[in-house]
Amino acid sequence: MFSYRHAFHAGNHADVLKHTVLLAVLRHMTQKEAALNVFDTHAGAGLYRLDGDYAKTSAEAADGFLKLVATQPKEPYAPALKDYIDMVAGFNTTNHWSVYPGSPFIIQSLLSGRDKLKLWEMHPTDIKTLTSNIAQLEAGRQVAILREDGFE
């Protein structure tokens, strides 16, 4: 098994793009009354510390999310990008930017009571962390976590 740990890469430039698009798509999809079933095939731990050892080891967030929020744009941010920054800000009590939500937390924060979220993760440590993190949401049966290959 390839042992990918997203905690080393949380908040990098790819996350900025991926999570901005994810948030915009989900905002659009949740405008309808129909229930959603959302799948995350590589959920990781779901929530990350940008001031933690893993993030500091790679320092990828410094060139991604942290660089974005440290920059004073000449023009206002595009609405989708502003929405993304505001979403991450909602997980932090100050502008210290220590907590970074992964896709599972971004998705779950937008779901209604009729929607479902299914998360797959194979890394033994990350699935334990993911399970603990998701338990804090008290989402009950709305969120299912599977220790399986999300592509199978």
Residue ranges and their predicted role:
Residues 36, 45-152:
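Class I S-adenosyl-L-methionine-dependent methyltransferase module
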Residues 39-41:
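Conserved beta-strand/loop positions that form the S-adenosyl-L-methionine
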Residues 1-33, 49-63:
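Class I SAM-dependent methyltransferase Rossmann-like catalytic core
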